[in-house]
From Swiss-Prot:
GO terms for cellular component: membrane; monolayer-surrounded lipid storage body. This is Oleosin Ara h 14.0102. The modification N-acetylalanine is found at residue 2. Pfam families: Oleosin. It comes from Arachis hypogaea. Coiled coil: none annotated. It comes from the Eukaryota. One of its GO terms (biological process) is response to freezing.
Length: 176
């Protein structure tokens, strides 16, 4: 009678509609007798995987060491500071409360200022939409008004200059 190690592996041929041929070997048992070999990959890790491990392990180890030292320093600092905090708590607690309230007040003032600016911006945009004017239209209108004002001032200056010249000639004639 034949045993499981005497049998050859079964071959299966799969034909796909794209006429590609794929050979699949069913691996139930290894003919050479090593059952563990069927679970190992046929090829080793790629170069990028090796580089990732070579870079990642020392980096991760260093970061783990630093986090451990940080934890140790925190525990030592807490062990030293706890009696000091307990002794000075009548002074420290009111100071912390005062500083906390001051920080909360500053943050609240900033939030109110920011809310005010946002409200002002919303009102300006709302008024612009109601009047139907946009910034470029307003700039063009302002340019036209400035040009008109410059023409008006220029004309008034000419008129004033002519009036002064006329008065000067009148004074010159009357004195002669």
């Amino acid at each position: 009678m034949a045993t499981a190690t005497d049998r050859a592996p079964h071959q299966v041929q799969v034909h796909t509609p794209t006429t590609q041929r794929v050979d699949v070997q069913r691996r139930g048992y290894d003919v050479s007798g090593g059952g563990v070999k069927t679970f190992l990959p046929d090829r080793g890790p790629s170069t990028s995987q090796i580089i990732a491990v070579l870079v990642g392990v020392p980096t991760g180890g260093t970061l783990l060491l630093l986090s451990g030292l940080s934890l140790l320093g925190t525990i030592i600092g807490l062990a030293i500071a706890t009696p000091v905090f307990t002794f000075f708590s009548p002074v420290i607690v009111p100071a912390v409360v005062t500083i906390g309230l001051a920080v909360i007040g500053i943050l609240t003032a900033g939030a109110c200022g920011l809310t005010g600016l946002m409200s002002l911006s919303w009102m300006i945009n709302f008024i612009r939409q109601v009047h139907g004017t946009t910034v470029p239209d307003q700039l063009d209108s302002a340019k036209r008004r400035m040009a008109d004002m410059a023409d008006y001032v220029g004309q008034k200056t000419k008129d004033a200059g002519q009036e002064i010249q006329t008065k000067a000639q009148d004074v010159k004639r009357s004195s002669s």
